[in-house]
C-alpha cells in the first residue's frame, strides 16, 4: 500500500524543477512502479520522460551531462536497472526505450572505463566521492550479466582518449594515467 501511495504521489510531483539525476531517478521509480502495479499511466509518463532525458543527459562521448564521474556511475546503474526491467517484462516496455538503452549503455561503459583510476576508483571531478556509487567492477559485472561487452583499456600501451563532449582527456603511458578536465570554465 505504501509503495503504491508513494508512486501515485510521485506521478503527480516529479522533480522536473531540479532536472538532472533527481528527475531521472523519479522516472526510473515511476517506471518500475508502473510495471509492477500494471499502471499504464505511470509507465507512459516514465517512458516519455526517459525517451527525452536519456539523449539529453548522456553526451555523445558517453558522459552524463552533470560531468561528475560518480553521478555518471549512478545513472549508468539506473540505465542498467531499466534495461534489466525490459528483459524481465519485454512486452511492458517499448522497443524504442530498449533500443535507446542499448545505444547509450555501451558509450557510458566506455566513458566509465576511461575515467576510472587505475585501481578502478572513481576520479574526483566535480562532486565525486568514493563509496556513493557501486564500484566499477560491480557495474561492469552487472553489465556483462545483461549482455554488454566490456573492453578494458590496456594501461601498458600509450593511449590518449579525448572525451570532447564532456571535456575530459585521459592519457595513459607505461601504466601511469592522467585524467584532466579541459572543458571551458
Predicted features and spans:
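Aromatic-lined, polymer-binding surfaces characteristic
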Residues: 1-105
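Carbohydrate-active enzyme catalytic cores, enriched for enzymes
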Residues: 66-185
Amino acid at each position: 500500500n505504501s509503495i503504491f501511495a508513494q508512486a501515485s504521489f510521485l506521478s503527480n510531483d516529479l522533480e522536473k524543477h531540479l532536472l538532472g539525476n533527481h528527475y531521472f531517478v523519479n522516472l526510473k521509480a515511476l517506471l518500475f512502479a508502473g510495471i509492477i502495479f500494471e499502471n499504464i499511466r505511470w509507465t507512459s509518463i516514465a517512458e516519455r520522460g526517459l525517451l527525452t532525458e536519456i539523449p539529453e543527459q548522456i553526451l555523445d562521448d558517453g558522459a552524463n551531462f552533470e560531468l561528475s564521474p560518480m553521478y555518471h556511475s549512478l545513472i549508468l546503474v539506473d540505465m542498467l536497472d531499466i534495461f534489466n526491467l525490459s528483459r524481465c517484462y519485454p512486452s511492458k516496455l517499448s522497443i524504442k526505450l530498449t533500443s535507446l538503452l542499448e545505444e547509450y549503455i555501451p558509450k557510458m561503459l566506455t566513458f566509465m572505463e576511461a575515467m576510472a583510476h587505475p585501481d578502478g576508483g572513481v576520479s574526483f571531478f566535480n562532486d565525486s566521492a568514493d563509496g556513493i556509487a557501486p564500484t566499477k567492477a560491480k557495474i561492469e559485472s552487472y553489465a556483462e550479466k545483461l549482455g554488454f561487452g566490456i573492453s578494458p583499456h590496456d594501461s601498458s600501451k600509450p593511449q590518449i582518449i579525448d572525451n570532447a563532449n564532456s571535456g575530459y582527456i585521459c592519457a595513459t603511458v607505461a601504466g601511469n594515467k592522467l585524467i584532466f578536465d579541459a572543458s571551458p570554465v
